Amino acid sequence: MSAKSNKIGVVQLTILTMVNMMGSGIIMLPTKLAEIGTISIVSWLVTAVGSTALAYAFAQCGMFSKKSGGMGGYAEYSFGKAGNFMANYTYGVSLVIANTAIAISAVGYGSELLGATLSPLSIALWTIFTLWLATVLNFGARITGHISSFTIWGVIIPVVGISIIGWKWFDGSMYVNSWNPHNVPTFEAIGVSISMTLWAFLGLESACANSDAVENPEKNVPIAVLGGTLGAAVIYIVSTNVIAGIVPNLELANSTAPFGLAFAHMFDETIGKVIMGLMVMSCFGSLLGWQFTIA
C-alpha cells in the first residue's frame, strides 16, 4: 500500500514531461524564427507531429525494455553493446552542442540585461566561462535537481504568461506582414525552420526514463508522454507566434533577448529587465542539469 502511495499518477507525470522539455530551448527561438518569418508556424506543426511520434516510440521502448540507460539501454536491447555505444555517443555529442547553445543564450540575455555590447570574441569567452562555471558548480544529482526544479520557473512564467496575456497586444497585420519577409521559397523556409523548432523538444527522450515510479506504467506512461509533448507544443507555438505579432519583425530578428523585448513592448523596460533576469536564471539552471547529464 505504501509503495503504491509513493508512485505518481498520470497527471503528475504529464506535468513533469512538459517541465522536462520546457528548459532553455525556447528562449532564443523567437529571434531565430523571425529571420525566416511567421511562415515558421508550419514548421512548428510538422515538428509537433514528429516529436509526438518520437515520444510515443520512446514510451513503447520503455515498456518493452527494462534496461537502464535510456536510449542506450533501448538500443542495447535490440542491437547489443555496439548499439548502446552508438546511441550514447551520438546523444553525448548532441548535448555538447546543446549546452554550448544554452550558454550562448544565457550570455545573450545577460548582456541585454546589463546593457552591455559584446563583440563576437567577448561572447565566446563569456560562453566558455559560463560552461566551466556550470561544470564546477555541479555538486551532484540531488542538489542539481533542486536547483533545476527552482530555476525552471524562470522560463515557465514568461512563456506561459505571454501565451495567455500576450493576445491583448497582438497585432494581426504585423503578424501577416512578417509571414515571409525575405521571400524565401516556401519549402526551403519550412525546412530551415524545422531544424530550429525541433531544438525546443530536447528532453522528450528522458520523459519515460523512470517508469518504475509510475502507477500502471503500461497505460499511464504513453498517455503522459503524448500529453506532455502535445502540451509543450501548444505553449511553444502560441508563445512564439504571439511575440511575432507584438514586436516588429526586424527588431525581433536582431534581438538577443526576445522574451524580454516582448514584455518591454507590452509593459515597460523594467518588466522587460525582470523577464531577462528570469531567463538568465533559467538558462543557468538548465545548463547545470544538462552538464550533469553529460557527466
What would you call each of these model-derived segments?
Residues G73-E76, G80, E112-A116, L226-L288:
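TM-loop-TM module centered on a large, flexible mid-protein loop between adjacent transmembrane helices
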